[in-house]
């Protein structure tokens, strides 16, 4: 198949974030989605243990009202199913990812030298820059939004870039490792329902486990401590739920406060709205309505839509430089493995397969090494150039280069016999008589050399060593 043949791929297949997709892009998870297995086990494990306990109690002939165990079991399984459902709804949907931009935003802002404290986003060309932050108005309040260097856009208000998922997320709350997903505008209500249902389930199992112990204490007429020692399964559930409820219960209380004040976890830790008015606060009822009863905004990304693989790669590689002066896409991103499975696009638009061994190299370090080698080469050339001037202007005695360059060439021009070098190229040891014209050239070289180095000819060479040839008698007639 020709490399220039157009290939259509779905957006999720060339997505540059760290997300994992299932079911053809219908389900989107974070890079740490494997934590879902642990979370599921932590939910289902105690639920199964509680089911076993209640079932054995219902089958025990000594139980006075076994039918009461049926509704208890039903409620526990309803809470468990809801908990798993909210967990999956939180972790498997788009949290509100902001689509990446392929080119930086157009701006008319010019660099202002009078505001040195202003931060700018710029390329290597300092004349063309865009501001790091800009002001937008939200409900009559001025809010600063930042420019995202990765997504090449100004983040919407309340959005932030998640370093784990490598995406900007609307109304970013936090990245939850227990659900393996960012918590944003499109899954926050499910996240709150997940932690609140988990809290309810823990309290429910904790309470009925104690009731089982007390019922044994009453039925068998034994002490409470003896009843505890005989009911090991209930003991395990009590300890587990007691520990767990401090975590999920604390989160539920904290996020209940955030909902009532219309804050996110990110804003609560970063800003202090008690010192200034919260531009998003609509009152307690308005805030609750916004979280639970308002319509969830649709996803801004159509992950199942088709895109041209080559065009998408070119758009990601060839970031325009009209605003930044240079591309903001690094050399490592130009040869990106996540997009095309190790393919590189040349200037004509043709795509080529990159060898496996070259796919994980750090090209930025290679470029830095090349730049250092270029600088060293330039310094060596510069040193060699001055050394060449030194050899031309300060001639050591019996130097074949001197006799060939000045003596022989001069004699060839004047038709005179040099005597500075023998016909077979060996030094004869004879001094060369230099004409007035050549002596003036040599003295000019000496003056230029001493002026450039800031020292007298007799002081020595570049490295400070004494130059015994600087006052050679050969420089005299």
Curated annotation (Swiss-Prot):
Keywords: Acyltransferase, Cell membrane, Lipoprotein, Membrane, Palmitate, Transferase, Transmembrane, Transmembrane helix. It comes from the Eukaryota. It catalyses: L-cysteinyl-[protein] + hexadecanoyl-CoA = S-hexadecanoyl-L-cysteinyl-[protein] + CoA. The chain crosses the membrane at residues 32-52, 68-88, 190-210, 236-256. Residues 378-388 have a biased composition (Basic residues). Pfam families: DHHC. Belongs to the DHHC palmitoyltransferase family. This is Probable protein S-acyltransferase 4. It comes from Arabidopsis thaliana.
